[in-house]
Amino acid sequence: MSPAPAGATALPGPLPGDVHDAVLALAAAASRADGATSLSEDAVLRLRAGDGAVQHLVRHEDGVLAGYAQLVPSGDGEGDGFEGELLVHPGHRRRGHGGALLAAVEERAGARPVRLWSHGDTPGASALAARAGWTRARELLRMERTSAGLSDLAVPDLAAGLAVRPFVPGADDAAWVALNAAAFATHPEQGRWTLDDLRARLAEPWFDPALLLLAEAPDGLAAFCWMKVEDGLGELYVLGVDPARSGAGLGRALLVRGLRAVAGRVDRVDLYVDGDNLRAVRLYAGLGFSRAATDVQYASGPR
């Protein structure tokens, strides 16, 4: 354990069990208060990772974890900057913890740019960012719909030569990663997935290969729709289409099949989509999804 600037404490990963649990408890409290999942899945998985590139910053008050920030290199180049997340326990807000963590993040980043997620678009996060000279760089929408009527969705036909089948762990891993990279070549997070990233998800208790649907052509995979079911909640986890087949309705055809696959197992289905991806937003709205919350990524100002 080493002291970090501005009164934060830096911890190497993987986090000790008690700190790991405290971060998850903090995130759960923030999620309840803000109406949004306050720590992304990637960030949660990094709590257990021993990757030296992950920086964990914590703030305590009266022996209780009051705030947490996570920082990782962005992109593939060492000089590209950093990205991460910052959250403060709702019972310890307006006491300087957010500002102290943000100052520690800036100190560790030096002159390199940083982007931090705030989940839920809260007034407190917006005010903190404004005081520090950070600006809104990206919005991620959470859209949702009830499960009512999912099983009644009309199933679109597939183009000739395409067939839908479930994912086969081990056999399909490499082909899936290649298609995912092509489908999300311009996406700042999803397109960087490696085999290790995929296999970390395949090892999660919620993973069900029957809910990872593949559209296969004679020359290889053409698209996929990955649904997640956990604790009665459904999620469109990832929907990807080979760019060469974009615009032909393949994404919608697979998504309808995915939604029908979780009908009867969930009360609600959520999904996340970039706010500026208007084409995808229209697709989801046409299938009954509506905007429920917004996550904001803030970019650091000049230092």
Swiss-Prot record:
Domain of life of the source: Bacteria
Binding-site residues, acetyl-CoA 1: 86-88
Enzyme class: transferase
Keyword Membrane: no
Protein name as it appears in the record: Mycothiol acetyltransferase
Role played: Catalyzes the transfer of acetyl from acetyl-CoA to desacetylmycothiol (Cys-GlcN-Ins) to form mycothiol.
InterPro entries: Acyl_CoA_acyltransferase (IPR016181), Bact_Acetyltransf (IPR050832), GNAT_dom (IPR000182), Mycothiol_AcTrfase (IPR017813)
Quaternary structure, from the entry: Monomer.
Domain N-acetyltransferase: 10-156, 162-303
Single Gene Ontology BP annotation: mycothiol biosynthetic process
PROSITE patterns: GNAT
Cited NCBIfam families: mycothiol_MshD
SUPFAM superfamilies for this protein: Acyl-CoA N-acyltransferases (Nat)
Keyword Acyltransferase among UniProt keywords: yes
